[in-house]
Structure formats: structure tokens, C-alpha cells
Design a protein with these regions (language model features):
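N-terminal phosphate/diphosphate-binding loop that engages ATP/GTP or pyrophosphate donors
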Residues: 23-77
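Phosphate-binding/switch loop-helix module in NTP-utilizing enzymes
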Residues: 75-105
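Conserved C-terminal guanine-recognition region of P-loop GTPase G domains, centered on the G4
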Residues: 101-118
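The conserved Walker
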Residues: 11
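Walker A (P-loop) ATP-phosphate-binding motif of ABC ATPase nucleotide-binding domains
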Residues: 4
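Conserved lysine of the Walker
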Residues: 15
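Hydrophobic anchor at the beta1->P-loop junction of P-loop NTPases
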Residues: 7
Length: 118
């Protein structure tokens, strides 16, 4: 059974550190883990002009570039895609999905609070 949890909170509250350490611990214990991180619109960079980006720009729904060790995946999302639908479409074969952000989703959440935000 897949387990999905979202980690939300203000910047510098420990979300990324927690997700990274959970990923390490779960992976070391034999679990498969996917991490989905919400970022600001327009902040993602990809290699324009490279073949994988060209395929994506010309309409491929999914474009994967791989060097044999690491892969980069570009996916066109539908309007309103949330982590639940992204998970259903692409992350179906992992034990844990750790989501950083997506505070408005209906996913179970771990909420990080800093002294300044209390």
C-alpha cells in the first residue's frame, strides 16, 4: 500500500531537511520513495535547445533524458493538476510519496511552524 504525505510550512522551517532525511532512512530500509516538490511557477529550468526539451516543446506529453545514471523527466500537466493526480499518473510504483508543499491539497500533512509564525 502506497503512503503519501505532504510537508508544509514557511521557508526555512525544516521541510526539505526532513523530507531528505526521511527519504534516506526509508531508502536504506528497502522502501522505494518518490519526492514531489512544489516550486514557484516559472522557476524551473531545463535545457532549452537540447533534444529532450525540443520534444517537450513540440508537444510530447512526456520527455525523458537519461545519461544511464540520472534521468530528467519533463511532463505536461493538465490545468489544475494537484499532487494526487500527479501521483496517480506517474508515481504509482513506489512505497512512499513525500510531497513538499501543495498546502491546498487534500493530502495528509505534516505542518512545520517556526517561532516567528506562531
Amino acid at each position: 500500500m502506497q503512503r503519501v504525505i505532504s510537508f508544509i510550512g514557511p521557508k526555512n522551517s525544516g521541510k526539505t531537511t526532513t523530507v531528505s532525511e526521511l527519504t534516506r532512512g526509508l531508502s536504506m530500509n528497502g522502501f522505494s520513495v518518490a519526492v514531489l516538490k512544489h516550486v514557484e511557477k516559472g522557476s524551473l529550468e531545463y535545457n532549452k535547445g537540447k533534444d529532450s526539451a525540443k520534444h517537450f516543446e513540440h508537444g510530447a506529453q512526456l520527455s525523458i533524458a537519461s545519461d544511464g545514471e540520472i534521468s530528467s523527466i519533463l511532463v505536461h500537466l493538465k490545468d489544475g493538476d494537484d499532487p494526487g493526480s500527479i501521483n496517480e499518473r506517474f508515481l504509482f510504483n513506489v512505497d512512499f510519496v513525500l510531497v513538499e508543499g501543495y498546502s491546498k491539497s487534500r493530502l495528509p500533512k505534516a505542518i512545520f511552524i517556526t517561532g516567528a509564525s506562531v
